[in-house]
């Protein structure tokens, strides 16, 4: 599968090139070549002298390469710095698994610089192995076997490497409730079997520094005694943190570092310390005193993420040797801790050597390429091209599995800066291995223009040419440094170029030259920008039929408003100046109840188009015309004395007119008038035709109504009394009959049932026998 790797690299490079070429140039407030380069990876700058025309801003020089070429900029005058990478290979004679040793990147904002990193797994690389064991009481059988493992462990390491060392440490838990029993007797001997000798509980004890002496390992481990605690989870993460944070005390070399973690139970993590009133977060520092973690009761347990970061920082690969019931738990843990493995430990730890060998082979055959923490302005992505044919693109870290000894694999690293950055460095390394790649990052934001030595006369002798643009001396401004400031600051000059104290100079469409706006020439054909603050143009008006102001034959655009010719009107000159469609049969425009706009009536409220007549479903103002109808026809009512003045706009018709609205209203004397309203042109103007006859209804008989009402009330009262009397009589009759029945059922004699006789007769039993 190896021949595919160059093809994949070529494909990735072509895709990256296509992505860059397809980018556009989005610019904002660009006046220098540096501003242009910072605007985006697709931007380029034309340094050609006099490239911009009259009224064109300097930002015209900034565009895509294709656009600049089309505008007449020679290819040699286009400044387009690229991101690039320079590598320095490892020194000869050094055994390096990772190359190159150093890379220098020149980064343009938004444009990635790519370089290749090669990893070649070496055979026999030195190994340090630290055995960290749980000494809670349930591990008593395991401790007995581990005491004999010194020679086997070193022999297993020597099968892999020529330089192997082993060390030993142990842990139990924090020595406060509820983790251990704090009774003095239990602290001396925490084991459930009092006859068995146990050591007091402790958090972590560093027993043996890393050594290649197997006898010393067996001797020191042989001195260890089992201990005990209360709860099931152990303080293993506390111990692992100290092993990672104390490299000098443990004796770690700058080689492959393995940490074997042997236990038969779970683990406490951050937050559990609150159960023992331990609130201070773990600080991730070394706190060993006399090889004991004596500050255990002062700091909480570390979090899993904190421990993972510390292990990766210390380049330590943990191997979790756990019993069967705990395998799934620690497999979840390995998903968070990179470069870690899990092995199933037998109940008495007899298989620990084979477990370590298997886990090491698994760890060393998988390579993770990662980097240290970077600022937000730098982004790193990895493309992995593995020897087994598997490829991954644009991942947050490199990842290859099944890596074989002496078979190189390639990672492509792509680094992108989001802005012009300061010079800085970071390192890339393969997790679990000691080799690193140092990456030095420098900004690529300046243009190497060739006009630095040109004659100052181009800028009127008051400035110098930089990348085709005049950089004026103090006291002068302008495109050719033609404007003298006379002591005024640039802010004061720009103030007169801001409309309504806006923050935008010349509406963003011009340059402020000597305190006056010089409007830009637009790229849009036939568009003209003008106005004191360049706030106007001749295209930003309403459109009709796809044209501004309906086209030049209808009107022209002036600063956002259409000015129509004599034959047209409307906001977009869309209407002819005609009222033909607004005239009624009498030739009155909109019946006098609206305005004619675009040959269509815009009616007043209460009327409807097309000619502003009464709404068919709307109410008729009959009541409002009743007083005028009464005075005009019958010469009476509230307007009888001034009828001609009050009802001058209402005409009395002698004969009915078809199409009128029928009304029926009461007059001042309560009689009904029937009349017809006929609408005339204008607002609230009606003619009226009134029927000759009034409908006057006789008044009601008040005496009859009052007498009937009083009589009805009296009769209803009498009827209610009769009904009440009848009901009470029936109730009394029913009670009397029941009493009679009870009387017949009773049996009485002449004796009082409550009387008790005062005489008592007692019989003598002896007398009866005789």
Swiss-Prot record:
Name of the protein in question: Integrin beta-2
Modified residues (Phosphoserine): 746, 757
Classification via InterPro entries: EGF_extracell, Integrin_b-2_sf, Integrin_beta_N, Integrin_bsu, Integrin_bsu_cyt_dom, Integrin_bsu_tail, Integrin_bsu_tail_dom_sf, Integrin_bsu_VWA
Binding site for Ca(2+) 2: 173, 229, 231, 233-234
Signal peptide limits: 1-22
Membrane topology note: Single-pass type I membrane protein
UniProt domain VWFA: residue ranges: 124-363
Originating organism: Capra hircus (Goat)
Transmembrane parts of this sequence: 702-724
Domain observations: The VWFA domain (or beta I domain) contains three cation-binding sites: the ligand-associated metal ion-binding site (LIMBS or SyMBS), the metal ion-dependent adhesion site (MIDAS), and the adjacent MIDAS site (ADMIDAS). This domain is also part of the ligand-binding site.
Spans within the Extracellular topological domain: 23-701
Record lineage: Eukaryota, Metazoa, Chordata, Craniata, Vertebrata
């Amino acid at each position: 599968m190896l021949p595919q790797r160059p093809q994949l690299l070529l494909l990735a490079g072509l895709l990256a090139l296509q992505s860059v070429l397809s980018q556009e140039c989005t610019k904002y407030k660009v006046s220098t070549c540096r501003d242009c380069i910072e605007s985006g990876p697709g931007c380029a700058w034309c340094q050609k002298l006099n490239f911009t025309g009259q009224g064109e801003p300097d930002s015209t020089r900034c565009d895509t390469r294709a656009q600049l070429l089309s505008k007449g900029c020679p290819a040699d005058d286009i400044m387009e710095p690229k991101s690039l990478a320079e590598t320095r290979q490892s020194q000869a004679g050094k055994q390096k698994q990772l190359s190159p040793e150093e890379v220098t990147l020149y980064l343009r904002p938004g444009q990635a610089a790519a370089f290749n990193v090669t990893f070649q797994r070496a055979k026999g690389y030195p190994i340090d192995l630290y055995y960290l064991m749980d000494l809670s009481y349930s591990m008593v059988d395991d401790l007995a076997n581990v005491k004999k493992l010194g020679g086997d462990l070193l022999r297993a390491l020597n099968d892999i490497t020529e330089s192997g060392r082993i060390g030993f440490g142990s842990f139990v838990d924090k020595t406060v409730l509820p983790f251990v029993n704090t009774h003095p007797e239990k602290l001396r001997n925490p084991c459930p079997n009092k006859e068995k000798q146990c050591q007091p509980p402790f958090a972590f004890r560093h027993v043996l520094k890393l050594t290649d002496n197997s006898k010393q390992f067996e001797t020191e481990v042989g001195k260890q005694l089992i201990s005990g605690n209360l709860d099931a989870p152990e303080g293993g993460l506390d111990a692992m943190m100290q092993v990672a944070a104390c490299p000098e005390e443990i004796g770690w070399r700058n080689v492959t570092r393995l940490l074997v973690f042997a236990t038969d139970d779970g683990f406490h993590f951050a937050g559990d310390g609150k159960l023992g009133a331990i609130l201070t977060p773990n600080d991730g520092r070394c706190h060993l005193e006399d090889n004991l973690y004596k500050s255990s009761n002062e700091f909480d347990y570390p979090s899993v993420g904190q421990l993972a970061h510390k292990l990766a920082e210390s380049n330590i690969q943990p191997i979790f040797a756990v019993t069967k019931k705990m395998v799934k738990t620690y497999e979840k843990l390995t998903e968070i801790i990179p470069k870690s493995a899990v092995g199933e430990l037998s109940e008495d730890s007899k298989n620990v050597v084979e477990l370590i060998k298997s886990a090491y082979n698994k760890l060393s055959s998988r390579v993770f390429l990662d980097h240290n923490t970077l600022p937000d302005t730098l982004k790193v992505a990895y493309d992995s091209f593995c020897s087994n044919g598997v490829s991954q693109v644009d991942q947050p870290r490199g990842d290859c599995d099944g890596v074989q000894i002496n078979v190189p694999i390639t990672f492509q690293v792509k680094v992108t800066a989001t802005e012009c950055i300061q010079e800085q460095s970071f390192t890339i390394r393969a997790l679990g291995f000691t080799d690193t790649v140092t990456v030095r990052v420098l900004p690529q934001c300046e243009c190497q223009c060739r006009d630095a030595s040109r004659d100052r006369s181009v800028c009127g002798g008051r400035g110098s040419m930089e990348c085709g643009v005049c950089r004026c001396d103090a006291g002068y401004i302008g495109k050719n440094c033609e404007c003298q400031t006379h002591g005024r600051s640039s802010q004061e000059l720009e103030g007169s170029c801001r409309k309504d104290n806006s923050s935008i100079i010349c509406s963003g469409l011009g340059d402020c030259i000597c305190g006056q706006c010089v409007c830009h020439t637009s790229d849009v054909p036939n568009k003209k920008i003008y106005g004191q603050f360049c706030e106007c143009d001749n295209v930003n008006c309403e459109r009709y039929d796809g044209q501004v102001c309906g086209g030049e034959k209808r009107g022209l655009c002036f600063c956002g408003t259409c000015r129509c010719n004599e034959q047209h009107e409307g906001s977009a000159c869309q209407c002819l100046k005609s009222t033909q469609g607004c005239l009624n049969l009498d030739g009155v425009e909109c019946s006098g109840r609206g305005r004619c706009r675009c040959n269509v009536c815009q009616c007043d409220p209460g009327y409807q188009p097309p000619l502003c007549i009464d709404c068919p479903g709307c109410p008729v103002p009959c009541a409002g015309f009743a007083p005028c109808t009464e005075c005009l026809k019958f010469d009476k009512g509230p307007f009888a004395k001034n009828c001609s003045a009050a009802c001058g706009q209402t005409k009395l018709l002698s004969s009915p007119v078809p199409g009128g609205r029928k009304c029926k209203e009461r007059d001042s004397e309560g009689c009904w008038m029937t009349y017809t309203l006929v609408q005339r042109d204008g607002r609230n103007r009606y003619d009226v035709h009134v029927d000759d006859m009034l409908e006057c209804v006789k008044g009601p008989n008040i005496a009859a109504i009052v007498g009937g009402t009083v009589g009805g009330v009296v009769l209803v009262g009498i009827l209610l009394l009769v009904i009440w009397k009848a009901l009470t009589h029936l109730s009394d009759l029913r009670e009397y009959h029941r009493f009679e029945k009870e009387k017949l059922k009773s049996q009485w004699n002449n004796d009082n049932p409550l009387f008790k006789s005062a005489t008592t007769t007692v019989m003598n039993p002896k007398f009866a026998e005789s």
